[in-house]
């Protein structure tokens, strides 16, 4: 199982044991935070969701959580894969590691390719936040499915045609709950995600406050 379903790309994997890499501790730190929030993990069918990645800004290679790791409370380097090459047109990816790279690897690649200053990407699932942000922040088309070359091209399109580089967050209209935040590191990507969640909580409190008591139910 992948983190959000089946891996849809062709994957050429070189099976090697990955050693601890730069950014690994930070990846685990913010993954734990996301686990506590319930925005990554496994659903009631045992299928995992959500993924994180980090890269060295000097290279196009990046490390990403492996497919099927949503159930794990803590990761080891072996639970990640190193993406070393990809081709959107061929729906192809090459990675290194003992696990297959996340099904959303091409989406992460599209973000990195579009903005050289980005060194971390978080793809999480938060249906409440997704609903609040849908078409209010840069949004990929509803007909575009996750983990496909079309999604990678759609993400590149957001960078070309919207202010996503300023907002540092976008949602996937065709992938219910799918929210992606990015930044110079995982701390800044997580901060952007947290800011949007807090904004939504504030809007929800205001809606409740402005709803007449007789219309609140209960």
Regions found by a protein language model. Name each.
Residues 1-218:
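Glycine-rich flexible loops
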């Amino acid at each position: 199982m992948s983190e959000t379903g089946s891996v849809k790309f062709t994957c050429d994997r070189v099976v090697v044991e990955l050693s601890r890499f730069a950014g690994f501790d930070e990846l685990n730190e913010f993954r734990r935070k996301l686990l506590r929030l319930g925005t990554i993990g496994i659903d009631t069918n045992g299928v995992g969701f959500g993924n994180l990645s980090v890269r060295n800004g000097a290279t196009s290679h990046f490390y990403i959580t492996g497919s099927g790791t949503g159930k794990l409370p803590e990761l080891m380097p072996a639970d990640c894969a190193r993406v070393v090459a990809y081709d959107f047109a061929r729906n192809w990816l090459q990675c290194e590691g003992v696990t297959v790279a996340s099904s959303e690897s091409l989406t992460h690649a599209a973000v990195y390719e579009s903005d050289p200053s980005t060194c971390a990407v978080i793809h999480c699932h938060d249906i409440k936040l997704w609903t609040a942000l849908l078409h209010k922040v840069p949004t990929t088309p509803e007909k575009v499915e996750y983990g496909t070359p079309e999604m990678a091209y759609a993400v590149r399109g957001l960078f070309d045609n919207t202010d996503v580089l300023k907002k540092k967050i976008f949602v996937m209209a065709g992938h219910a709950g799918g929210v992606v935040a990015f930044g110079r590191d995982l701390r800044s990507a997580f901060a952007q995600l947290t800011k949007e969640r807090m904004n939504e909580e504030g809007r929800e409190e205001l809606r409740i406050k402005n709803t007449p008591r007789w219309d609140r139910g209960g």
